[in-house]
Amino acid sequence: MTIDSGFNHITVLLDEAVEALALRADGCYLDGTFGRGGHSRLILSKLGPQGRLLGFDKDPQAIATGQALAAEDGRFVIVQRSFAELGAEVAARGLHGKVSGVLLDLGVSSPQLDDPERGFSFLNDGPLDMRMNPDQGISAAEFIATAPVEEIARVFKEYGEERFAGRMARAVVERREKQPFTRTADLAEVLKVANPAWEKGKNPATRAFQGLRIHVNNELGDLEAGLEAALDALEVGGRLAVISFHSLEDRIVKLFMRKLVKGEADNLPRNLPVQHKVFEPKIKLIGKAQFASEAELKANPRSRSAVMRVAEKLR
């Protein structure tokens, strides 16, 4: 996630994430979530002439920023694809199993969140969109207009962890029958009224909006696919660093890494004769989970939920 402070984009866990990759001057690296390029620029500053960096993003504004960087630095290439598709891109470039490190900085960036026209925020009124790539998939407004009440409730509960999901979904459906939702502030107001127990210091629409955004962009599905693709792309000794911003993301990352540290025995029937190597771990964890420092928290309050996990490929 990139924090936007006025006109300055401040990347969360910038130094920590780049350090975690243990960069080699001639290595090949992937930034799966280019954003506004904070991590990528620091990586490039540490690579030598033979180093390479491939950036991915779905957002057209991020791609424009990446294209400008690519024009300045021939070691960098930007690709408008989800990091879930990095396997195909890596294979097409002949880099499968040759990548030295992959960085995934998950979630929505502050420039996206703070731009009302992107439709992510309940604080700034804008069109109810929420798509990372406005040219692909259905918008939040389209989903809200057509989904059954049970599906809306599931999205609020499963992806937003909203305990009043059913009540809020029913309020949405009741209102849409009279007038469709097209604006973020309109939806936020209905959710606000339908939520009977506000959390201190948190907008009552927060969890439902998170659920909608995750669903519209298939964020958790992309994460699961992206983790597998990243591991396959890495060379032995290559590193994977993942920064997540809410418990659903972090749970997926943690379980993925835990499974690979233990080996694959948990996935096999008991007493099945297998070769010993099946039980050997595929990765090792590098340190413990890292969080934003006190100084970073003070400068960027949105970094408070950031957690980074790092692993190294063993085989």
Curated annotation (Swiss-Prot):
GO terms for molecular function: rRNA (cytosine-N4-)-methyltransferase activity. It is found in: Cytoplasm. Its EC number is 2.1.1.199. It comes from the Bacteria. It holds the Pfam family Methyltransf_5. It catalyses: cytidine(1402) in 16S rRNA + S-adenosyl-L-methionine = N(4)-methylcytidine(1402) in 16S rRNA + S-adenosyl-L-homocysteine + H(+). The keyword Methyltransferase applies. One of its GO terms (cellular component) is cytoplasm. Keywords: Cytoplasm, Methyltransferase, rRNA processing, S-adenosyl-L-methionine, Transferase. The keyword Methyltransferase applies. GO terms for biological process: rRNA base methylation. InterPro entries: RsmH, SAM-dep_MeTrfase_MraW_recog, SAM-dependent_MTases_sf. S-adenosyl-L-methionine binds at G37, G38, H39, D57, F83, D105, Q112. Its main location: cytoplasm. Gene3D superfamilies: Putative methyltransferase TM0872, insert domain, Vaccinia Virus protein VP39. Belongs to the methyltransferase superfamily. RsmH family. Specifically methylates the N4 position of cytidine in position 1402 (C1402) of 16S rRNA. This is Ribosomal RNA small subunit methyltransferase H. The lineage of its organism: Bacteria, Pseudomonadati, Pseudomonadota, Gammaproteobacteria, Pseudomonadales.
